[in-house]
Amino acid sequence: MIPIGNSISWFTGAILVLVACGTDKPVNEVPSEVASKMAAQEAAWNAGDIPSFMDIAYWQDDALLFVGSKGPTYGFEATLNNYLKSYASPEEMGQLRFELLEWKTLGTKHGFLLGRWALDRGDELEDLSGHFTLTWELKPNVGWVIIADHSS
């Protein structure tokens, strides 16, 4: 959701195809569990806690996909390590704000979330902002988790 970098990939095209196949569920009706997890991630980030930011919503599996400017990263641990390297100080992390723009239901166990992110990093560092697309999956005994994140 916060880029480790920017990238255009086949993943974007695949997601757009999946979105086109969604149901007639109204746009912007983000499931309450997803909205709650996004708010909890925002709070964890703003508390300087990247591990909790990851634990709250990302699928803790080697198949997790994060796409940014450096290309795809696979796996929960690799994605966590990239975040820790890219945002090594509270100043670099700044204060995170999410705006949830559009939810599309993709069957009974998947959804697609389009949103904006912004980092207010004070006077010392340039503020950052961009968009994200998240593919969510409803996992038994876990609930909704992010299985793919494309952030720019």
Label the predicted regions:
Residues 9-19:
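Bacterial N-terminal signal peptides
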Residues 50-105, 109:
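A solvent-exposed, acidic/Ser-Thr-rich amphipathic alpha-helical stretch
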Residues 1-11:
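Bacterial N-terminal signal peptides that target proteins for export
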Residues 21-52, 56:
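Short, low-complexity N-terminal intrinsically disordered segments enriched in polar/charged residues
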Residues 108-117:
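A short hydrophobic beta-strand element
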Residues 91, 119-127:
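Short, cysteine-centered beta-strand-loop-beta hairpins and adjacent loop/turn segments enriched
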Residues 129-152:
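Short beta-strand edge/turn micro-motifs at domain boundaries
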Residues 83-84, 98-104, 117-119, 131-138:
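Hydrophobic/aromatic beta-strand elements that line small-molecule binding cavities or substrate pockets
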